[in-house]
Design a protein with these regions (language model features):
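Residues forming the flavin
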Residues: 1-203
Length: 203
């Protein structure tokens, strides 16, 4: 879902596996429906990093093991920006084209990391929400917007992103979107993840 536009697909345009879900149901497994959202990806050079609060990486990360050699760690500098009243107003302006508001996207979403449009709806008393701008890698040109996942239409995404400090001239490389997916009821699995109904099938 990008606004009211929707189509069958896997993540990032991959092939849909809806036939697999159908096959599992035909073989006696119960499935349900869940939803997750992704964030717009920004062009790194279009962000004014000097306007933002820098978030430095730790100089030496903690290891899970005391054994082995230390590895060279090249951190990536991230930055903090925030939504504001203009951001929220832009989103409300486009609620008539929001699949979340219009009810076309009604599957259960993540409990602890709601989309930014969901936050605007559920927490109207909040004037601002923190957004972390995270380069995908040190040499990359793509920036991930942590805490800004959305299913809003592209126009709403571009307008709202450009209300953020440091993002007034931002370019969206890939829009955020919501994706609905099937899951198999986990009570149908053994603790070692083999299905109870189909011996030898692990999920």
């Amino acid at each position: 879902f990008i606004g009211l536009t929707s189509y069958k697909s896997g993540p990032l345009g991959m092939v849909s596996v809806s036939g697999l879900s159908k096959s599992l149901r035909e073989n006696g497994l119960k499935t349900g429906r869940l939803r997750t959202d992704t964030t717009p990806r920004l062009l790194a050079d279009s962000v004014d990093w000097d306007m933002l609060d820098r978030q430095e990486s730790i100089s030496e990360p903690e290891s899970f093991s005391h054994f082995g050699q230390k590895r060279v760690y090249k951190g990536v500098i991230c930055a903090l920006t925030r939504t504001n009243a203009d951001t929220h107003e832009v989103m409300r302006k486009y609620f008539d084209r929001s699949p979340l508001v219009q009810g076309t996207l009604d599957s259960e979403g993540p409990r602890y990391c709601p989309s930014i449009d969901d936050k605007v709806i559920r927490f109207p008393e909040k004037d601002t929400h923190p957004i972390f701008l995270e380069p995908i890698n040190p040499e990359g040109r793509e920036v991930y917007m942590q805490n800004f996942s959305t299913s809003m239409c592209l126009e709403a995404q571009l307008e709202s992103v450009r209300t953020l400090k440091g993002c007034g001239s931002a370019h969206i490389l890939r829009p955020g979107y919501a994706i609905e997916y099937d899951f198999v009821d986990p009570t149908q699995l053994y603790p070692w993840l083999e299905t109870r109904k189909i011996p030898g099938l692990f999920l």
